[in-house]
């Protein structure tokens, strides 16, 4: 995904949260390994992947935490939110209940994230499915209300997956307070419009 011969600008902690079954693991595995398993088992506790990517000429290392959506794992909550610079909150466009519970997940982010300016991305997953129950307009409205980035995606078809991480990481890099200021020199292209409800142009 990037040239490992160059040292990374920084290491970023990225969380993927949301209800069980919305496709969190599938999104992570599609991004990291470019694979999709329709029989992907539910995450037990926390899964973890490390990868790297290059944004505007800056290589960054990503520590991606894929969290379980089940209530019985809520005791893990404070530890895995600690120090996160980015949070991807996923819902399933075919599951109305997963969308309605987004408010709960946003409350968790506000309660447990130690970085006040953590970058949040709302991902409407499974847009390849025909039985959609949550409209794009509803997702955009929620994202605007909670001041998060927004994108629609499909881990199955790959649509929007790369853009999800690229847009999130670019916004983090544009927020220097979120990462190590011991290395202040970095190169950025023209800043993109990352206002609430922005859709990646990939």
Curated annotation (Swiss-Prot):
Its EC number is 3.6.5.2. It catalyses: GTP + H2O = GDP + phosphate + H(+). GTP binds at residues 20, 23-26, 37-38, 43, 69, 126, 128, 155. One of its GO terms (biological process) is intracellular protein transport. It comes from Caenorhabditis briggsae. Transmembrane segments: none annotated. GO terms for cellular component: endomembrane system; Golgi apparatus. A motif (Effector region) lies at residues 40-48. This is Ras-related protein Rab-18. InterPro entries: P-loop_NTPase (IPR027417), Rab (IPR050227), Sigma_54_int_dom_ATP-bd_1 (IPR025662), Small_GTP-bd (IPR005225), Small_GTPase (IPR001806). Keywords: GTP-binding, Hydrolase, Lipoprotein, Methylation, Nucleotide-binding, Prenylation, Protein transport, Transport.
């Amino acid at each position: 995904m990037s040239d490992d011969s160059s040292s990374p600008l920084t290491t970023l902690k990225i969380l993927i949260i949301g209800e069980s079954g919305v496709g969190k693991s599938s999104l992570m595995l599609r991004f990291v390994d470019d694979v999709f398993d329709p029989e992907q088992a539910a995450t037990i506790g926390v899964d973890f992947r490390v990868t790297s990517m290059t944004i505007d000429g800056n290589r960054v290392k990503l520590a991606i935490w894929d969290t379980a959506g089940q209530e019985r794992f809520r005791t893990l909550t404070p530890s895995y939110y600690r120090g996160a610079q980015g949070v991807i909150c996923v819902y399933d466009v075919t599951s109305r209940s997963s969308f309605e519970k987004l408010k709960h997940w946003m409350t968790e982010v506000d309660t447990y994230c130690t970085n006040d300016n953590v970058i949040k991305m709302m991902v409407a997953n499974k847009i390849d499915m025909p039985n959609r129950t949550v409209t794009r307009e509803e997702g955009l409205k929620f994202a605007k209300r909670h001041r998060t980035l927004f994108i629609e995606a499909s881990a199955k078809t790959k649509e929007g997956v790369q853009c999800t991480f690229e847009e999130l990481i670019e916004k983090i890099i544009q927020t220097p307070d979120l990462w190590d200021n011991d290395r202040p020199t970095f190169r950025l292209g023209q800043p993109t419009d990352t206002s609430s409800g922005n859709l990646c142009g990939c």
